[in-house]
Amino acid sequence: MELPILPTSVIGSYPKPRWLLRMYKLRELGKIPEEDFKEAVKDASVAVLREHERAGVDIPWDGEMWRSEMTEHFTAKISGFKFYGPVRVWGNAYFNKAAAVDKLEYKEPLVLEEFLWVRENTTREIVKVPITGPYTIAEWSFNEYYPDKESFVMDLAKIINKELKTLEEHGATYIQLDEPAMLNHPDEVPLAVEAINRAVKGIKIKVGLHVCYSNYYLLADYFDDIRVTQFALEFANRQFRDMDFLKKLSGKELGFGVVDVHNPRIETVDEIVRAIKKAFNYLEPEWLYINPDCGLKLLDRRIAYQKLVNMVKAVRIVRKELEKEGRAETEFRTLNDI
């Protein structure tokens, strides 16, 4: 399968419509039937898909409309977790932090229904399914059962592996593991790497790994050891500085973050064009995907949309220049290709 050179994608989350946030609150209070909530989620999913498509994104997602939060969604569906209540993250942001109180088991699909709905309702051939990785789920949960972190993380890796196999069996072609916490503790990075490799064991489709706001020089030491097709990393927030760690990236793709998801300022098309060309100092264009730094959910929806629009406009400008050199397409690589 071939894609246009410099395929554009998203990382995962997107601002939820205000009416969907109200539905989440009503559901939490037990004031609406579950079928009404599900209908609202599906409507929001289609609305966000259309925004991504209208912006021109090649490989969209629905902005995680089905998910209340990136770890809570998964821990709520994995047997062995228990919720005690909300935990403050920063400012006025809270999430329900789960505790492992028994052996963790895969009791039901985690995102299968979500994927099938998105695939049915998109006009694009490929969608990217983001899934929170095993190390981050463990890092952002309490452990009240396992004797050590390793056994906790590796049981989660086995559960994620079952979900990836379920998705692959149902036609998913591109999955992204989100591991924003994997570099929190340098001495535990080998454990995170082992967990990622266990999670993708037996998987043949395309798998990306998203890591953000971390020491990428530490990650670069493991580029060759991590069995993924692509590393989706943030660069706009760090103003595209200190990128020499990319010299260690070979034989795998880079998802190049070109818009800052923590800054409401909308990057200009020219700024994004210059950023993309800077990446060419490290990788050939055929090994680059273009995406935001991270999930866009913390931004105003109109700002998030315009950032995507400008990202796509910039890519189209660079594509035209590359096409003059006879470089118009890129291969859709999978784990079988690395």
UniProtKB/Swiss-Prot annotation:
CDD domains: CIMS_C_terminal_like
Statement: the UniProt record of this protein carries the keyword Cell membrane: no
Superkingdom of origin organism: Archaea
InterPro entries documented for this protein: Met_Synth_C/arc, MetE_arc, UROD/MetE-like_sf
Enzyme Commission code(s) on record: 2.1.1.-
Cofactor: Zn(2+)
Amino acids binding Zn(2+): 210, 212, 234, 294
Pfam families for the chain: Meth_synt_2
Coiled coil residues, start to end: none
GO MF entries: 5-methyltetrahydropteroyltriglutamate-homocysteine S-methyltransferase activity; zinc ion binding
Pathway participation: Amino-acid biosynthesis; L-methionine biosynthesis via de novo pathway
Single GO BP term: methylation
PANTHER family assigned: 5-METHYLTETRAHYDROPTEROYLTRIGLUTAMATE--HOMOCYSTEINE METHYLTRANSFERASE
Similarity comment: Belongs to the archaeal MetE family.
Function description: Catalyzes the transfer of a methyl group to L-homocysteine resulting in methionine formation. The physiological methyl donor is unknown.
Protein name: Methionine synthase
